Swiss-Prot record:
There is a cross-link at K181, K201 (Glycyl lysine isopeptide (Lys-Gly) (interchain with G-Cter in SUMO2)). Residues 444-454 have a biased composition (Pro residues). This is Homeobox and leucine zipper protein Homez. PROSITE patterns: HOMEOBOX_2. The modification Phosphothreonine is found at T443. Ubiquitous. Strongly expressed in testis. SUPFAM superfamilies: Homeodomain-like (SSF46689). Residues 286-296 have a biased composition (Polar residues). The gene is Homez. It comes from Mus musculus (Mouse). Gene3D superfamilies: Homeodomain-like.
Amino acid sequence: MLGHRLLPSLDFPAVSEGYKPEHDMSPNKDASSLNSSAAGLVCLPPVSEELQLVWTQAIQTSELDGNEHLLQAFSYFPYPSLADIALLCLRHGLQMEKVKTWFMAQRLRCGISWSSEEIEETRARVVYHRDQLLFKSLLSFTQQSVRPPQERPPVLRPEQVALGLSPLAPSEQPTHMKGLKVEPEEPSQVSQLPLNHQNAKEPLMMGSRTFSHQSDCQDLQISGLSKEQAGRGPDQSCGKTASWNHFTAVHQPDKPASVSLLDNSCKEESEPSGIPPSSSTSSPSFQALANGTTATPKPLQPLGCISQSLSPSKKALSPQVEPLWPQRLWNNSEPNSAGPTEYLSPDMQHQRKTKRKTKEQLAILKSFFLQCQWARREDYHKLEQITGLPRPEIIQWFGDTRYALKHGQLKWFRDNAVLGTPSFQDPAIPTPSTRSLKEWAKTPPLPAPPPPPDIRPLEKYWAAHQQLQEADILKLSQASRLSTQQVLDWFDSRLPKPAEVVVCLDEEDEEDEEDELPEDGEEEEEEEEDDDDGDDDVIIWD
């Protein structure tokens, strides 16, 4: 008897493939929405404890739906830690087991199924935006508008337009479903659902801010929520509708078969749709998702297959439909189009150009990582003060280092790790080697780097005087933050180079010297002749 009231587990195809109710996904429902019997039991899959199943009463999963504090916590992050749940219970007088059960039920209602690694990665990204409720679109704090749901005009999603789907008439729209229970009387429906678990990770179309207050739950019925929602932009959150097509074909038997044939005929045309490629880093995309605004779609008309005259880059969108993502994220590949071609804004491009960390900064980060691999918010704040690095770079460094450690690529950690400490810590298990915040508070911050030299005072002085005075050397050295020798060298480089002097001997001087040499020789010859004459004058008498 209990088998008729079971919710599918985490690995059940109905949940893992984006199985969602047709209309009402809001947690503000009666207890009977999960189970028609108050004494019925449901099976909830937790995150930890090796995915063991939790059995609980169906009424406990919805009795806290009116608690605004829990709705606020779920809007901030759908996977709160045990410490966050305990703090909620202490502040608002709640029972911890009921709160944990409530969060499990909300994740199932919204089709959320993340792994533990994805939870930690997304939590590290959401920590920058503590004031923004990124998951508020899944909840509804206000009641539906006065107009009944059956009188509202059906709204087409871009996926429906790309596949040529027409809106359903009020008589053709499916009825409300009672929770997420699966009746065993229809095993063929469950077996026809896709078996690929990766389709459960389709991101939610969060581009429009009207989800949380004005739009009905039909806007959320064709999309699931995954951790890529916080790290990827809205430009990547459309274009895949396999799970929705299966859901439409299985759970709408009264719908004409022409729609299914139309889906198959248009599938080949919608595959080469020009969806902008994702960027290599997730932090800029996350900011674009959190801060970006989107265009409101215009009223649509029933459309068939898109004509072949459209370019392949625009087959996924009709000319009458405005895209749900910002136009600056759309890469228009046609040469004649006038749209922007850059994905990233100047702020995002500036964030990519991060400076290299100094040896002192890396030493402080490594010393903390050796003690604790999962830093808290207070630790990030203190490390930000000590190292002078921005918090996003610190958190990114911790994430990359944990990834390298998990895959055995961290040699310095193995060389310096304390004996007896595990190679990879579980963030939920505190260790005695964790360094407390008081110890880190004693660490003095790194000295600020000296400012770069400024030669503008030297240029002004040179333009005014054109010569360096010895009395002004010290003053110029202080103003330019250069040493006195550097100031002298700078002014020496400005002085004009001395002219080269070439000494040339005149030809007249050379001739005079040549004339003097023969005169000396003639005097010597005259002296020799005089000596000879003296010898001839000697007379010998006998």
